[in-house]
């Protein structure tokens, strides 16, 4: 089920964060609470970043994504196969970022379903131009914001295993996902997200 969200561009500084999501998933599975994860992020620097503000930012972002997942999916991120774990992280980003979800649903899914080979610069440009026409909020962003969004979308898809490369002709990949994960997400009523991830 898709919940209406406001458009935001904070994803610019929050890529896939797969290893960070995996670390926190394992901690939550061990019984750690959210506040304890935040404390460990600062006192033990579990994300291995330089500044306190970045430690807090990553902890907040990771926990916000994990909050929309159930115990089974959190456990799968920590202990499941890597392709399915990354797909769950991608699912959590789509669930928490409206613009990224719309890009995946309106642009990436179409290419996936019809077996198109590449994700091009034009795909991004057309998508962002359309969103500027549809939303005053998006229209107020500057060119650099769109440049950074494009960069991070590409990086997320590459790190999640859905693109072979980040530069030039970005070839689309089709990861093999655990059928139990696929069916679980569909059973939650989130088939629209799963259709994107499996290309149906």
UniProtKB/Swiss-Prot annotation:
It comes from the Bacteria. Coiled coil: none annotated. Induction: Part of the brxA-brxB-brxC-pglX operon. Disulfide bonds: none annotated. Transmembrane segments: none annotated. One of its GO terms (biological process) is defense response to virus. Keywords: Antiviral defense. Pfam families: BrxA. The keyword RNA-binding does not apply. InterPro entries: BrxA, BrxA_sf. BREX systems (bacteriophage exclusion) provide immunity against bacteriophage. Part of a type 1 BREX system. This system allows phage adsorption but prevents phage DNA replication, without degradation of the phage DNA. Methylation of bacterial DNA by PglX probably guides self/non-self discrimination. When the brxA-brxB-brxC-pglX and pglZ-brxL operons are transformed into a susceptible B.subtilis strain (BEST7003) they confer resistance to bacteriophages SPbeta, SP16, Zeta, phi3T and SP02 and partial protection to phages SP01 and SP82G (these include lytic and temperate phage). Belongs to the BrxA family. This is BREX protein BrxA. The lineage of its organism: Bacteria, Bacillati, Bacillota, Bacilli, Bacillales. The gene is brxA.
